[in-house]
């Protein structure tokens, strides 16, 4: 099913909402969020220990965290503030995965106080953590970076070797031995190799890399690996012609690799964790803004009342976000515009040379 270019909100609904909440604002599709969370849970139901730790950084909103909590989701936190937010909505203990890098002392102290599972990014963090909190937790995780280029068939998905995250193969082996000697009893392994992959093959391929590494680590270090965290990376379709991922196919793909690699190694008790963010929220949120100025110089500009502060991706990454002019969903896209915000930065643009229907002042634009 192709993503409709039509958003989940109508012009009439927005006209009602703006009577209470003026633009710009973010809007969420609660029904969509719930259905997706349920589908994810079902896709991994074959694994008794399965848990999704929602990547709070993706949408740090306590109301949304509470919805996901109803479906058994925990929180993947990477900062002090995210830990505070998780605690505020009643998510604590092992329902928090603290995956950070370049971590300040205060963050480790709070993670420990809340009883979070700490996922170490670097081998030097073992001593730093022990010095900071006075002990090594009994349950601990390490982040792995296999290096090199990560490919699916002939497509380069990403370049882990160029990533600042995780430990090398030698380092994670050494880390597990050291942590075991310092009293850790239950271990986890985590890796993130590619971002926003719109393919059903990414998770099963990542799973194979991690499962084989887990078998080797358990054999070489004698530790008990309790969980394997596939982190995030499952993407969403941003353009109308992209096909969305099928989470059922992905879950089944991971199950096959689990039975091929872990079960024969006597590791059929390992829990699978995920840290999806964009996949959980991306399709179910939008930014609603109003056209307030039209400027015609060397190009045609539509100025809106939102700016990069409300949605940074287009300015930061040049990322594509679909724009719908409400009430003109079926009108021909025969006008070329740059859609801009009001920041004194020339990159404050939601779209460049975008074909849209003719935009009138006062029109509501949905960026999704």
Language-model features and meaning:
Residues 132, 146-290, 356:
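Active-site loop/helix belt of alpha/beta enzymes
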Residues 46-48, 135-136, 222, 244, ...:
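Short, glycine- and charge-enriched coil/turn segments that flank and shape catalytic ligand pockets
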Residues 64, 108, 150-152, 199, ...:
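Short acidic, gly/pro-rich beta-turn/loop elements at beta-sheet edges
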Residues 1-138, 174-181, 185, 219, ...:
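A charged N-terminal "starter" segment
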Residues 74, 97, 119, 141-143, ...:
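Structured core elements
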């Amino acid at each position: 099913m192709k993503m409709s270019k039509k958003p989940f909100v109508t012009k009439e609904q927005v006209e009602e909402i703006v009577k209470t909440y003026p633009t710009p604002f973010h809007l969420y599709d609660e029904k969509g969020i719930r259905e997706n969370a349920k589908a994810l849970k079902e896709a991994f139901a074959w694994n008794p220990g399965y848990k999704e730790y929602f990547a709070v950084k993706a949408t740090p909103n306590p109301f949304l965290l509470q919805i996901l909590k109803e479906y058994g989701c925990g929180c993947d936190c990477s900062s002090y503030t995210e830990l505070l937010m998780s605690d505020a909505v009643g998510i604590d203990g092992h329902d928090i995965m603290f995956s950070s890098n370049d971590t300040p002392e205060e963050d480790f102290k709070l993670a420990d106080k809340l009883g979070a599972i700490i996922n170490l990014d670097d081998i030097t963090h073992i001593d730093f953590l022990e010095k900071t909190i006075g002990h090594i937790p009994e349950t601990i995780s390490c982040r792995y970076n296999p290096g090199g280029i990560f490919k699916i068939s002939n497509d380069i998905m990403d370049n882990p070797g160029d990533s600042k995250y995780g430990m090398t193969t030698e380092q994670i082996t050494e880390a597990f031995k050291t942590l075991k000697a310092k009293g850790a009893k239950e271990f986890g392994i985590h890796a993130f190799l590619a971002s926003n992959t719109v393919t059903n093959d990414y998770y099963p391929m990542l799973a194979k890399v991690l499962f084989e590494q887990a078998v080797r680590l358990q054999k070489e270090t004698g530790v008990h690996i309790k969980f394997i965290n596939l982190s995030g990376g499952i993407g969403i379709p941003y353009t109308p012609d992209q096909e969305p991922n099928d989470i059922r196919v992905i879950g089944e793909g991971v199950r096959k690799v689990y039975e091929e690699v872990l079960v024969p190694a006597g590791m059929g008790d390992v829990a699978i964790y995920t840290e999806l963010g964009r996949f959980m929220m991306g399709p179910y949120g939008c930014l609603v803004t109003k056209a307030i100025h039209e400027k015609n110089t060397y190009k045609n500009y539509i100025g809106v009342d939102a700016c990069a502060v409300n949605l940074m991706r287009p300015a930061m990454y040049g990322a594509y976000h679909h724009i719908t002019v409400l009430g003109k969903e079926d009108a021909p896209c025969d006008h070329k515009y740059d859609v801009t915000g009001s920041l004194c930065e020339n990159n404050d643009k939601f779209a460049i040379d975008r074909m849209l229907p003719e935009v009138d002042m006062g029109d509501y634009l949905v960026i999704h």
